[in-house]
Structure formats: C-alpha cells, structure tokens
UniProtKB/Swiss-Prot annotation:
GO BP of this protein: ribosomal small subunit biogenesis; translation
Gene Ontology cellular component annotations, sorted alphabetically: small ribosomal subunit
Protein name: Small ribosomal subunit protein uS4
SUPFAM superfamilies, A to Z: Alpha-L RNA-binding motif (SSF55174)
Assembly and interaction partners: Part of the 30S ribosomal subunit. Contacts protein S5. The interaction surface between S4 and S5 is involved in control of translational fidelity.
GO molecular function: rRNA binding; structural constituent of ribosome
Annotated organism of origin: Novosphingobium aromaticivorans (strain ATCC 700278 / DSM 12444 / CCUG 56034 / CIP 105152 / NBRC 16084 / F199)
Length: 203
C-alpha cells in the first residue's frame, strides 16, 4: 500500500474531526491525532495554524488532492468575479469525482475517484476517466453498464447518513448537475471555512 493511499485513513485523526461523517471513523473512538504523541496537551494555536488547519480540512475532504492541484484551484477562484471562498467551493464541487460522490455512485470520495479512473463514468454519454474534470451546469453524469452491477454502488446508495443534494438531480443511474452550489448548500458533515483558506494563501 502506498504512503499516499495509507494516509487517507489518518486524515480524520490528524484533524481530530470526522470530516466525512462516517460512522466507523477512528475519531469516533478517540479524538487525538495519530502516532505515539497524539495525546499531548494542545497548545494555543496561532492565526497561521488556524488558517493552515482550515486548508488541510478542506483539501482533505476533497480526497486529499495534491497541494499543487488545490492551490491551482484557489488561484483560479481568486481570478473569478465574486467571493473567492465561495468560488473555491464551487470549483471543488464541480470536480467529476465529487459529483460521482454526491450522486451516491460511490461510498467515499476515494472510491469515487477510483470509479472514474477505471472508466465507469460517462459525461453527456462520453466515457471520462479524469477525476478532476470540471462538470458544468446541465451536464449529465451516468454509470457505465458494468458499474451498475458493482457492489460498491449498491453500498453507496444504501448509506442512510448521506443524501443527494439539490444541485445534483438524480434519475436512476444518472444525475444532472443543475448548478454550482454556494457554501451553505454543500452538505458538509463539519464546518468548513473557505474564508480562512483565502487568508492562508493571501499571506
């Protein structure tokens, strides 16, 4: 198992929050970070530390995308009209792997990325294996024939703690991305603070 693949299981513990709202999260059993020094008494966190943590939490939630990808997305958001934090959230929610996750075509964002990379997802009838692909309002995302029979899909759709948000219109084995959501519309299990992410990169 690669270090990057193994690290995903430590994201919740590192942040001390169950960022995906998973019943089996290790944070539900212990709230301190991973490693032998995880139980040390917490010291006062600086403004920089607070901003860094907000960035790590948001980046981690979206499948722990690389810093290069995340910063590039932020830079794009900062050049758009309107609030940069809101723009950042909108761009992240437009990722194909995230739309697949929101549609409950996969139980986790990591498995959603895998479903895309293995060629099981179609956008407007055309196969797409690029997880970071930008989905536009009106685009239809659907499952391939083989994917419809995968146990992974049935597992995801049976999860009671997750609902398909309003900006993803579900219709059987396909969904339509209806609009770019605002921060308040995104069903985060924990509080996200994109304004602090903006402050982090604006230093």
């Amino acid at each position: 198992m690669s270090k990057r693949k193994a690290s995903k299981y430590k994201i919740d513990r590192r942040l001390g929050e169950n960022i995906w709202g998973r019943p089996k999260s290790s944070v539900n059993r212990r709230s301190y970070g991973p490693g032998q020094h995880g139980q040390r008494r917490k010291s006062k966190v600086s403004d920089f530390g607070i901003q860094l943590r907000a960035k790590q939490k948001l980046k981690g939630y979206y499948g722990d995308v690389t810093e290069k990808q995340f910063k590039r997305t932020y830079q794009e958001a900062s050049k758009m009209k309107g609030d940069t934090g809101q723009n950042l959230i909108g761009l992240l929610e437009q990722r194909l792997d995230m739309v697949v996750y929101r549609a409950k075509f996969a139980p986790t964002i990591f498995s959603a990325r895998q479903v895309v990379s293995h060629g099981h997802i179609y956008v407007n009838g055309v196969k797409c294996n690029i997880a970071s692909r930008r989905v536009r309002p009106g685009d239809v995302v659907s499952l391939g024939k083989k994917a419809k029979e995968m146990a992974l899909i049935a597992e995801a759709q049976a999860l009671p703690e997750r609902e398909v948000p309003d900006y993803v219109a579900a219709d059987g084995d396909k969904v339509t991305f209806t609009r770019v959501p605002t921060l308040d519309e995104v069903p985060y299990p924990v509080k996200m603070e994109p304004n602090l992410v903006v402050e982090f990169y604006s230093r």
